[in-house]
Every structure is written in C-alpha cells, then in structure tokens.
Amino acid sequence: MRRTAMTQTILAPLDGKVFQVMVKPGDTVEEDEEILVIEAMKMETPIFAPCDGAVKEIGVKEGDDVLENDILAVIDSKSNEV
C-alpha cells in the first residue's frame, strides 16, 4: 500500500466576517471537524474540514472580512492507495 498526500483548499462559502478560528497550522483534523466560523447577517456558519489531515495554513484570522471563494485554509490530506 502506498500513502499519498493531497492538498485540500477550503474556500469561503459566502461573504462575512471570521468569527472564530479553532485550528492553527500543524494541527491534525478529522473529516467534518469544525475548524472555523463565519458570521454573516447575524448568523454563524460553521466551516468543516473536508477530510482527515494536517492544517497546512490558515489564510484568515478572527475579525477578518472575507468574500465568497476567499481561501480560508489549506489541509494536507492523507489517502491510501493500493
């Protein structure tokens, strides 16, 4: 079995303000783990990790304004291949 790494880029699904960041570069995350929250129109939208892996970078900090499709984070995912 061979292990390969893929990079997953997490984009903002909507315009808003970064309300909370729960992870930092180097942290290990699991698929569907909440990694940050965006606030828009007084509603909080959680952002979840799309895969298991390690946080490579966080492109935002709490209080930042973001636009739809801005890069929020990058995760190095691990996948197994036979």
Spell out what each predicted region is.
Residues Q20-K24, E57-V60:
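Short histidine-centered loop motifs in beta-beta connectors
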Residues E68-V82:
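Glycine- and charge-enriched low-complexity intrinsically disordered segments
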Residues M1-K17, E34-P50, S77:
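Short beta-strand-turn/beta-hairpin segments enriched in glycine/proline and small hydrophobics
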Residues G26, E44-I47, D52, G63:
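A short, glycine- and basic residue-enriched loop/turn
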Residues F48-E57, E81-V82:
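Short, compositionally biased
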Residues K24-I35, E62-L72:
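Short, well-structured beta-strand-loop connectors
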